[in-house]
Regions:
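ABC-type ATPase nucleotide-binding domains, specifically the catalytic core motifs of the NBD
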Residues: 2-21, 30-31, 126, 142-143
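Conserved catalytic motifs of ABC-family nucleotide-binding domains
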Residues: 61
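Helical segment within the ABC ATPase nucleotide-binding domain
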Residues: 80-92
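H-loop/switch region of ABC-family ATPase nucleotide-binding domains
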Residues: 101-102
Length: 146
């Protein structure tokens, strides 16, 4: 039954060296959360809960952010914000984002490089411009034949 503010405070303390400015940085990234900062997290909309989860991950300014299927369960508006956010994290904060994702349109909008895994093996990698439908179809057809 914690508020947004309390959630962020706990996340900040997890590193043992809380930085008060970091919370303001998170509120800059997620202005809607600032407006709701005294609201209990369990009463938030799914989109706001999603933003709070991202804010908790970012409040300690990690050098590397790992996201596994970040669009899963996200509404359209959050997906649009996520595209902008990931670009901003990399461009302005120099943060590296490692992304596991199946939606090619999203990958093409946010990634610089890709690594295609098939059954746990790296089968292709390169600049995201090299990620084409033929390459995907080749590996998807192999999976269908299994």
């Amino acid at each position: 039954q914690l508020t947004i503010e309390e959630n962020l405070h706990i996340a900040m303390r997890a590193t043992g060296k809380p930085n008060p400015e970091a919370k303001n940085d998170v509120y800059d990234l997620f202005p809607a959360l600032y407006a709701l900062r005294r609201t209990r997290a369990n009463t938030l909309s799914p989109d706001d809960q999603y933003q709070l989860a991202l804010a908790n991950a970012l409040v300690n300014r990690p050098h590397l952010l790992i996201l596994d299927e970040p669009l899963h369960g996200a509404g359209h508006s959050v997906a649009q914000k996520l595209v902008q956010l990931l670009g901003r994290l990399n461009r302005e904060l120099g943060m590296t984002v490692l992304l596991a994702e199946q939606q090619l349109s999203f990958i093409r909008r946010v990634a610089d490089r890709f690594c295609l895994l098939y059954r746990g093996r790296n089968v292709a990698q390169g600049h995201v411009n090299e990620l084409d439908d033929e390459l995907i179809a080749h590996w998807m057809s192999r999976e269908a034949k299994r």
